[in-house]
Regions:
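Active-site nucleophile and cofactor-binding loops and adjacent substrate-binding regions
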Residues: 46-49, 91-100, 115-119, 137-145, ...
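Glycine-rich phosphate-binding loops at beta-strand->alpha-helix junctions
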Residues: 81, 218-219, 223-246, 257-261
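Glycine-rich phosphate-binding/hydrolytic loop that grips phosphoryl groups
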Residues: 101, 147-152, 256-279
């Protein structure tokens, strides 16, 4: 199982008063963020296969590199679609609440809308300057699975998510595809490629169709500035460009130190830290 992890070597967990872990078990990837006295210390990501095993793999990637043991972690909160299967968590919190808390922690108190585009779901969240949820809307059935659909499309054209995003961003023309449903759009894209339509036009058209599908969800709840976009698909520059054009608003710039797919895990760690401090 492939994993991606990083440790802040400037911090020493042995000197921390409170060690908190946030675990986000998504449909595509499982993520863990560790805080030391509220400061980011470590993160890891692994592919979600069997949720309870992926959760263990994600946290063990950090434990193995740092010498931390599970019993050293004072508080552990799980979130995401597979949160109930994290056997070592002490509490679960919804991914809606965690996304809002994590976004405000990273981008600051001006954030009012969080758009979370993950592998299996798309969520739009209104929040306060403290990172509390005011309102939210989950994807309708035709916006579901956009992240995974985009991965399938990338496999189809033998590129990764970031590569197809760059191609879409730089394309001068796009093929108009159905934006009603990600499955229909993917089928149309496949047919177009088989019919020798230039790949860059199909790629650009597919990004445009997915962005329109997402923007329909945003319109149902409404958009309040400032906007941040998180989740795995936030790393795709083509989707971001199309969304900003359709919504007629620029998102807050991404933070280079933070993978947008880690924000909900960070939020879970924030809840874990706050929960321990209240004890």
């Amino acid at each position: 199982m492939s994993e991606n992890s990083s440790i802040n070597e400037q911090l020493d967990w042995k000197k921390a008063k409170v060690i908190a872990a946030g675990i986000d078990i998504g449909a595509v990837n499982s993520k863990v963020v560790i805080l030391l006295d509220g400061q980011p210390y470590a993160f890891s990501q692994v592919r979600t296969l069997i949720p309870k095993e992926s959760a263990s793999s994600a946290i063990n990637a950090i434990l193995d590199k740092t010498g931390l043991k599970m019993e050293n972690i004072h508080s552990r909160v799980a979130t995401g679609t597979g949160r109930s299967q994290v056997l070592f968590s002490q509490k679960t919190v919804s991914e809606i609440a965690c996304a809002a808390a994590g976004a405000v922690k990273i981008w600051g108190p001006t954030v009012r809308t969080v758009l979370d585009i993950g592998g299996q779901s798309c969520k739009i969240i209104h929040c306060t300057d403290k990172g509390r949820v005011n309102d939210f809307l989950w994807n309708d059935k035709c916006a579901a699975g956009i992240g995974r659909s985009m991965e399938s499309f990338a496999d189809l054209v033998q590129k990764d998510i970031t590569e197809i995003g760059k191609i879409a961003l730089n394309s001068d023309e796009l093929l108009r595809l159905s934006d009603f449903c990600s499955v229909f759009s993917l089928s149309e894209a496949l047919d177009s490629i088989l019919n020798k339509v230039p790949a860059e036009q199909v790629i650009a058209g597919y990004h445009n169709a997915m962005a329109k599908r997402i923007s329909t969800l945003v319109a149902k709840l409404g958009l309040k500035e400032d906007l941040v976009i998180i989740g795995g698909l936030a790393k795709n520059p083509g989707i971001i460009n199309e969304l900003e054009n359709i919504l007629e608003v620029n998102r807050l710039a991404p933070k280079p130190a933070w993978d947008p797919a880690l924000i909900a895990a960070l939020g879970a760690a924030i809840f874990a830290d706050a929960g321990h401090m209240r004890q």
